[in-house]
Design a protein with these regions (language model features):
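Glycine-rich phosphate/pyrophosphate-binding beta-alpha loops
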Residues: 108-122
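Conserved strand-to-helix beginnings and helix N-cap segments that scaffold or border functional pockets
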Residues: 60, 122-123
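Active-site substrate-recognition segment that forms the wall
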Residues: 1-105
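A broadly conserved detector of short glycine/acidic/proline-rich loop/turn motifs that flank catalytic sites
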Residues: 19, 52, 114-115, 125
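Internal hydrophobic alpha-helix adjacent to the cofactor/substrate pocket in enzyme cavities
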Residues: 123-138
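Generic hydrophobic, helix-prone segments enriched in Leu/Val/Ile
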Residues: 66, 101, 115, 133-137
Length: 138
């Protein structure tokens, strides 16, 4: 079995917006601009994250990196406070789309999808794995 994977970096920040005139719930619940995922968590809380295909080291200036898709940042975003930062390394298939979910041979399955483009894939992937195991055991 010749499945190639490479490491990619995911980074995200949660920003608290302390501006009574801004209601983040007026934005879509989740949207993507140029590969940057924006997720509205509440009226005053926003998560911005992305995957960096070319690095596995987290950026020191994560706010600037994750908001550089905006030509002109709104003042409420510039005044926001970063309440959380996180990063992680995940695998990405080389030469085929993610997630890889394959029954390679009798009793050997592979599932590489946990998180992609702001979408948690683990529940669906786990369900697929459970079904494959059930079928194998029956």
């Amino acid at each position: 079995n010749n499945i190639k994977l490479k490491p990619v970096l995911g980074q995200a920040i949660e920003i608290d917006i302390n501006d009574s005139e801004v209601d983040l719930l007026s934005l879509p619940k989740q949207f993507n601009i140029d590969g940057i995922n924006i997720i509205t968590k509440s009226r005053s809380k926003l998560v911005i994250g992305s995957t960096d295909e070319y690095s596995t080291k987290p950026e020191k200036k994560v706010f600037e990196k994750l908001t550089n898709f905006l030509d002109k940042k709104p003042s409420w975003l510039l005044k926001g406070k970063i309440s959380k930062k996180w990063f992680g390394i995940r695998s990405r298939p080389v030469g085929e789309p993610s997630p890889i979910m394959k029954n390679l041979e009798n009793g050997l399955i592979i599932c590489t999808g946990f998180y992609k483009n702001g979408i948690l894939l683990a529940p669906a992937c786990s369900k697929w794995v459970a079904n494959e195991i059930r079928e194998y055991l029956s």
